[in-house]
Amino acid sequence: PTENGTIYYKQELEAISHVCHECGMPLFLDGARLGYGLMAADNDVTLEDIARLCDVFYIGGTKVGALFGEAVVITNPVISKDFRYMIKQRGGMLAKGRLLGIQFQTLFEDGLYWQISRHAIDMAMKLKKAFQACGYGFYVENSTNQQLPVLPDAVLEKLAGKYSYSFWEKTDESHS
């Protein structure tokens, strides 16, 4: 998903990939929230599509419970040439990289990565319904776990006394 929870559909990703490759530019997909995008109810993109259309992408780990890191996937052989040595020479390779790998091996065993992602979306949809039942709208409609309700500033002030939350932006004079 994007920063506001919307997703790219297959046709959009294909068009972006086409333009990038036509212009000789590699396409990188930031996969920090990849599981949530791929498990969204209206998603039509598969992991295989991403691997086919992108030159480099990563599979985010921390947002689905990993202690740290992302798994970088390089599908373009030109980019992958000597990649391992470049990151090692620049201090980007962990001496004990297997610790990172074990997390992803575990996350992808028995579909755990997808289960965690689906569960997060299901919980976000419950929150969304509760906000809607109270008459609140959302910054943007989406089907991922990133639900951004727009609330009256007075309500936010009351919430700030009891809860921690992130402020996105003001949507008008009295709502955020």
Q: Which residues make up each language-model segment?
A:
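Conserved C-terminal alpha-helix-loop-beta "cap" of PLP-dependent enzymes
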Residues: M125-S176
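Alpha-helical scaffold elements within enzyme catalytic domains, especially in hydrolases
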Residues: A15-V19, H119, A130, K158
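Active-site-proximal loop/turn and secondary-structure-junction residues that shape catalytic pockets
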Residues: R33-G35, K63
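General beta-strand structural signal in soluble alpha/beta enzymes
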Residues: L27-G31, F57-G60, V140, F167-E169
